[in-house]
């Protein structure tokens, strides 16, 4: 009679424990969501609720168009205000996921009579999706290593600086929703792998579709999952669940991806997707082999195998030869420039200056790893080890995800963002394993301390005696039933436990399964927990600091602190407001491509090039104009109907991201298309400088003149605070351009092209006769033929 | 008014509190009996 009572008490105890755990888990997840959202609000509180940087302005403009004109107009939108005179088909060249998401949120809120502006919705989209990404991380890690690890990983991801850098309030960019989509797609893949459910497989394809809609980084998914499938096949882990997880994703996912206009037939025609098809074929071959193996006798199977391998190899060679021929026949061997630069990190710097010129496409430095993932870098190895104990399909996927993400993050700093979730998941697993051991030890020691009843002491003595002789693996399976696939089968079988007890009674020691249970002394456990809390505390403090100080600046409003107090530099908006109020609606504004999106969004003026960078020749034309002498530049701009030229100059206030510092890229990109622009002409002994040592070509080019025109009037010396020296050419006049506006801190300067003078018949003769009378006058006129 | 320092304190507190909560979850779910037996 005592046994059923104790078993019901134990069942009641475990139910209570599970209930408490469930409540704690839900509460923690809620708080994680709150943290993920609130830690990203520094930008709004410190600055204002404003869209950040460059690309978000374009996304904002598209969302405004969508909310105003509806979805059909959006798909058909041809934007004639960019890339003049070419224009851009926005509906067919944009990843619409972010825009449609924010547009839907805005529409829903307005339907519920919550009248938020489109801008407000756009500003807060990224923090909302960060909370979603944290919850998705919880789900993914839970599938791989249990609820505890899931909670830890979600908490870490909610505040990881790498992700914060791309998802603060106002950072309305594709990555904000794409990281959520990425993690959620991985979760659904792993869930399908664990359950073999077609329902999850379909959801997985839909989630992949959302990812394709959101970000070009979807190619990471469609390459990583095939690699994992291949890994499973090679390591002999093929199962029907693997087939269900992969085959629907490829077929349905590719069909859905082809529906996105920007992807279209690329989903089946570019090499980024070929790996998935190849693995799809291999998977079917393997499935067929397993099927036939079940049908035939071993001997017959051997004969069949020989036949199939011979025929199969021949077919494979033929297919591979055709594929290679197809791929080789395309100009870039089927790979896009960005993908090639991922595989070969030196590719971009060699062949595509326009990709290499973007700072986020540069390889990261070691400090940036510490800045962006902090202590996670040291926890990851422990996470990898625990993923191998025991290795499941899900944990092998997580490890594979990390390995590939580490490689890609080493290629370009922007992809640290893809590494961050993997780092969080593995660190979460590592910390959770540590907490498991430590808390279990504390609980075990506590129960030993407080149990003094004879029965309990008998129990505890039995525990202590057998504590050192229990297989850790089986124990782990019981504590975390959801961790592995086999666990659910093992957990409910109380019979098994009874059997085990009986076996333990009859055969006290089983030498084969004996392993030391990881139970630590009380003091060591408590100290370990405290130390881990301190480590977590450091991580939290670093993350909050990064969110507050490093990643919250919207970059269109700058601040600096000095002894006088806070200085705000709002020059960009000042300049765009000037353009919007003082120029005609159809006027064309030329600037380096960085400022194209902002000009169209904030000033509503037509630009020549923008951040889309789809047409290298057009950008090279602007680069050439900026690198040319005034007259040649005027001719280029005039041929493009440009009325105003905008340059960003940081020499007065010490703003380093100005056009002078970007100028060499203009020269390189321009020189790539127009060979008369040569980089060495702008360098003195290989050094780029604009002081007295600067080359004449440099000191006479348009960019130098537009930036430093009248600069000497500010301090009398022409001292450039960014470069840290006095400029080379201080006193000069502009002949073909006139200054129309310079912002308060001289950060943005706007010039107007002087109109071409009418050719008056006989004027040449007059000029000639005038030159005889006064040579100095003529010289002056010759200098400035447009006046 | 809620300024950035308040938000900093709130985020720090919440972050560390979540860490503690996760440890509490592990403690609650830890089952030394199974380990012991």
Swiss-Prot record, chain A:
UniProt motif (WWDYG motif) ranges: 592-596
Segments on the Cytoplasmic side according to the record's topology features: 1-18, 145-146, 196-197, 235-239, 294-306, 389-394, 438-525
Site keyed Important for catalytic activity: positions: 166
Biased composition (Basic and acidic residues): 477-504
Annotated motif SVSE motif, positions: 357-360
Pathway it works in: Protein modification; protein glycosylation
Reactions it catalyzes: a di-trans,poly-cis-dolichyl diphosphooligosaccharide + L-asparaginyl-[protein] = N(4)-(oligosaccharide-(1->4)-N-acetyl-beta-D-glucosaminyl-(1->4)-N-acetyl-beta-D-glucosaminyl)-L-asparaginyl-[protein] + a di-trans,poly-cis-dolichyl diphosphate + H(+)
Binding positions for dolichyl diphosphooligosaccharide per the UniProt entry: 414, 597
Motif (DXD motif 1): 53-55
InterPro entries named in the record: Oligo_trans_STT3 (IPR003674), STT3-PglB_core (IPR048999), STT3_N (IPR048307)
Family statement drawn from the similarity comment of this UniProt entry: Belongs to the STT3 family.
Name recorded for this polypeptide: Dolichyl-diphosphooligosaccharide--protein glycosyltransferase subunit STT3A
Native source species: Oryza sativa subsp. japonica (Rice)
Gene that this polypeptide is encoded by: STT3A
From Swiss-Prot, chain B:
InterPro entries attached to this UniProt entry: Oligosaccaryltransferase, OST4_plant, Ost4p_sf
Transmembrane segments: 9-29
Annotated localization: Endoplasmic reticulum membrane
Cytoplasmic membrane side: 30-37
The keyword Phosphoprotein appears for this protein: no
The entry's keywords: Endoplasmic reticulum, Membrane, Signal-anchor, Transmembrane, Transmembrane helix
Any Pfam family: Ost4
Ranges of the Lumenal topological domain: 1-8
CC terms in the record's Gene Ontology section: endoplasmic reticulum membrane
Domain of life: Eukaryota
Membrane topology recorded in Swiss-Prot or TrEMBL: Single-pass type III membrane protein
Self-association state and partner proteins as the record states: Component of the oligosaccharyltransferase (OST) complex.
Family classification: Belongs to the OST4 family.
Function statement: Subunit of the oligosaccharyl transferase (OST) complex that catalyzes the initial transfer of a defined glycan (Glc(3)Man(9)GlcNAc(2) in eukaryotes) from the lipid carrier dolichol-pyrophosphate to an asparagine residue within an Asn-X-Ser/Thr consensus motif in nascent polypeptide chains, the first step in protein N-glycosylation. N-glycosylation occurs cotranslationally and the complex associates with the Sec61 complex at the channel-forming translocon complex that mediates protein translocation across the endoplasmic reticulum (ER). All subunits are required for a maximal enzyme activity.
Protein name as annotated: Dolichyl-diphosphooligosaccharide--protein glycosyltransferase subunit 4A
Natural source organism: Oryza sativa subsp. japonica (Rice)
Gene: OST4A
């Amino acid at each position: 009679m005592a046994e059923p009572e104790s078993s019901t008490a134990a069942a009641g105890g475990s139910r209570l424990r599970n209930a408490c755990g469930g409540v704690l888990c839900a509460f923690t997840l809620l708080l994680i969501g709150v943290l993920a959202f609130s830690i990203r609000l520094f930008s709004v509180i410190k600055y204002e609720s404003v869209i950040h940087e460059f690309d978000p302005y374009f996304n904002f403009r598209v969302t405004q168009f969508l909310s105003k004109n509806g979805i059909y107009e959006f798909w058909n939108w041809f934007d004639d205000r960019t890339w003049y005179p070419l224009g851009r088909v926005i509906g067919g060249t944009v990843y619409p996921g972010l825009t449609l998401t924010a547009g839907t949120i805005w529409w829903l809120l307005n339907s519920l009579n919550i009248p938020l502006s489109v801008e407000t919705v756009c500003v807060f989209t990224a923090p909302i999706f960060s909370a979603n990404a944290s919850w998705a991380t919880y789900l993914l890690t839970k599938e791989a290593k249990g609820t505890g690890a899931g909670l830890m990983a979600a908490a870490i991801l909610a505040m990881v600086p790498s992700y914060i850098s791309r998802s603060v309030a106002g950072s309305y960019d594709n990555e904000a929703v794409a990281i959520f989509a990425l993690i959620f797609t991985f979760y659904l893949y792993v869930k399908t792998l664990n359950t073999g459910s077609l329902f999850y497989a379909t959801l997985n394809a839909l989630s992949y579709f959302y990812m394709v809609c959101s970000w070009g980084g979807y190619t990471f998914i469609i390459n990583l999952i095939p690699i994992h499938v291949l890994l499973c096949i090679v390591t002999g882990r093929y199962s029907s669940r693997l087939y269900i997880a992969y085959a629907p994703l490829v077929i349905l996912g590719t069909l859905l991806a082809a529906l996105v206009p920007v992807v279209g037939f690329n989903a089946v025609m570019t090499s980024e997707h070929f790996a998935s098809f190849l693995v799809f074929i291999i998977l079917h071959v393997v499935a067929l082999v397993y099927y036939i193996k079940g049908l035939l006798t071993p001997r017959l199977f051997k004969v069949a195998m020989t036949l199939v391998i011979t025929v199969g190899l021949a077919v494979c060679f033929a297919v591979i030869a055709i594929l290679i021929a197809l791929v080789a026949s395309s100009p870039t061997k089927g790979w896009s420039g960005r993908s090639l630069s991922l595989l070969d990190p030196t590719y971009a710097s060699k062949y595509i200056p326009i990709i290499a010129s973007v700072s986020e496409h540069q390889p990261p430095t070691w400090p940036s790893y510490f800045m962006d993932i902090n202590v996670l870098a040291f926890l990851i190895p422990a996470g990898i080890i625990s993923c191998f104990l025991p290795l499941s399909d899900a944990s092998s996927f997580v490890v594979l995800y990390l390995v590939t993400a580490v490689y890609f993050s080493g290629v370009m700093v922007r992809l640290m963002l893809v590494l961050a979730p993997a780092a969080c998941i593995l660190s979460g697993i590592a910390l959770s394993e540590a907490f498991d051991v430590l808390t279990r030890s504390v609980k075990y020691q506590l129960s030993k301390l407080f149990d003094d009843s004879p029965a309990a002491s008998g129990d505890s003595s039995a525990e202590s005696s057998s504590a050192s002789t229990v297989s850790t693996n089986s124990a782990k399976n019981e504590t975390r039933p959801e961790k592995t696939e086999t666990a659910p089968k093992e957990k409910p079988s109380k019979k098994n436990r009874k059997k085990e007890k009986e076996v333990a009674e009859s055969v006290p020691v089983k030498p084969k399964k004996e392993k030391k249970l990881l139970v630590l002394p009380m003091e060591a456990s408590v100290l370990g927990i405290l130390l881990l809390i301190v480590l977590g505390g450091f991580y939290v403090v670093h993350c909050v600091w990064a969110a507050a100080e490093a990643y919250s600046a919207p970059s269109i409003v700058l601040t600096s602190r000095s002894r006088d107090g806070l200085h705000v530099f709002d020059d960009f908006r000042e300049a765009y407001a000037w353009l919007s109020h003082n120029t005609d609606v159809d006027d064309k504004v030329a600037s380096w491509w960085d400022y194209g999106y902002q000009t169209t969004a904030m000033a509503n003026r037509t630009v020549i090039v923008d951040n889309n960078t789809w047409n290298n020749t057009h950008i090279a034309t602007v680069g050439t104009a900026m690198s040319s002498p005034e007259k040649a530049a005027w001719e280029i701009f005039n041929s493009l109907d440009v009325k105003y030229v905008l340059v960003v100059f940081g020499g007065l206030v010490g703003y380093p991201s100005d056009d002078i510092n970007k100028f060499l890229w203009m020269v390189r990109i321009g020189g790539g298309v127009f060979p008369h622009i040569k980089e060495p002409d702008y360098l003195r002994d290989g050094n780029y400088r604009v002081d007295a040592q600067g080359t004449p070509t440099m000191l006479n080019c348009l960019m130098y003149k537009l930036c430093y025109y009248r600069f000497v009037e500010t301090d009398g010396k022409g001292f450039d605070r960014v470069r840290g020296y006095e400029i080379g050419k201080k006193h000069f006049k502009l002949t073909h351009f006139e200054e129309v506006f310079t912002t308060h801190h001289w950060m943005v300067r706007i010039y107007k092209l002087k109109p071409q003078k009418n050719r008056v018949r006989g004027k040449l003769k007059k000029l000639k006769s005038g030159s005889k009378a006064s040579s100095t006058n003529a010289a002056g006129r010759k200098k400035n033929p447009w006046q | 008014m809620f300024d950035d320092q308040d938000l900093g304190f709130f985020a720090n507190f919440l972050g560390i509190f979540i860490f503690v909560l996760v440890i509490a979850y592990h403690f609650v779910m830890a089952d030394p009996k199974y380990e012991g037996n």
